[in-house]
Amino acid sequence: MSGFSPASEVLLRHSDDFTESRVLFAGDMQDDLPARFDTAQSRAHTQQFHHWQVLSKPMGDNARYGLVADAEIVADSDTLIYYWPKNKPEAQFQLMNLLSLLPVGTDVFVVGENRSGVRSAEAMLEAHCPLNKVDSARRCGLYHGRLEKQPEFNADGWWGEYQVDDLTIKTLPGVFSRDGLDVGSDLLLSTLSPHTKGKVLDVGCGAGVLAAVLASHSPKVRLTLCDVSAPAVEASRATLAANGFEGEVVASNVFSEIKGRFDMIISNPPFHDGMETSFEAAQTLIRSAVRHLNIGGELRIVANAFLPYPNVLDETFGNHEVLAQTGRFKVYRAVMGRNAKR
């Protein structure tokens, strides 16, 4: 990452205020400012594996990835800088976790784009850390308060679930389509044949619903699931366990931690990164899939109909077909041949 996000640019206006502070950075960190900010000590906690990849190179063990924060990296911080995400339940989970570990008196800064709903931080933290707005620039707000009362926090109390047919889908704040099966995934599932065999990889697995439904009618399938999101990784593991299915679930930035080749790769790829529209992950998925598919294997993805994926599929695989479509979504299939662009 080279350029700074609008939220980081607002923080840089106040950089002189943090030079003596032991800062914990958390939330939706879209750049490497935590590694470059002038502080007495900088540490970072993130639930996003691709953010950890960027920050861990310059910060080493001072950057941590996981569902909940490590108490050891939080305890001696005297300042929290929290980047507000677009998902309010995700923000609430993270902030309650962090504030339950930080000492009373900690300086708390919350920064985010106005369109992300950062204003709601005031009401959310009112009982624990009353906030005041201290700056407004770049269509962002910066809020400050001091921790007055640690909240109670138990991650086990944040789980939710819903049913898809006879399957139990486990979810957590921050997981895509947390409240029920989304229309795109449902369309993709309608194209999957019973009794599928071989090795199947679900990229961007979310709560694990695609893999769970596939396993329910294809018991011989061998599953691997991956996602950048720590809540998604934990939710997918819980979904498989709740339904008695086996499979490996790994944190991975698309294929970064994936080894070997598969007979099918399925995905409902994201096209947002934070508040911004981003096709990078989906294009990486398509272009790199050929290095993770067996000959004759296939990539099957669902996407918003307006997204420009057919050209990328044809450039990479030399073929694609539309298996199903609605006014909003299309399910694409591309088959791995010997002439694919590897």
Swiss-Prot record:
Listed InterPro entries: DNA_methylase_N6_adenine_CS, Mtase_sm_N, rRNA_ssu_MeTfrase_C, RsmC/RlmG, SAM-dependent_MTases_sf, Small_mtfrase_dom
Regions crossing the membrane: none
Protein localization: Cytoplasm
EC number of the protein: 2.1.1.172
Source species, domain of life: Bacteria
Catalytic activities: guanosine(1207) in 16S rRNA + S-adenosyl-L-methionine = N(2)-methylguanosine(1207) in 16S rRNA + S-adenosyl-L-homocysteine + H(+)
GO terms under cellular component: cytoplasm
Disulfide cysteine pairs (residue numbers): none
Molecular function as annotated in GO: 16S rRNA (guanine(1207)-N(2))-methyltransferase activity; nucleic acid binding
Keywords associated with the record: Cytoplasm, Methyltransferase, rRNA processing, S-adenosyl-L-methionine, Transferase
Keyword rRNA processing: yes
Record bears the keyword Methyltransferase: yes
Pfam families linked to this entry: MTS (PF05175), MTS_N (PF08468)
Family: Belongs to the methyltransferase superfamily. RsmC family.
HAMAP family, per the entry: 16SrRNA_methyltr_C
Function: Specifically methylates the guanine in position 1207 of 16S rRNA in the 30S particle.
Subunit relationships: Monomer.
Protein name: Ribosomal RNA small subunit methyltransferase C
Source organism of this protein record: Cronobacter sakazakii (strain ATCC BAA-894)
Gene: rsmC
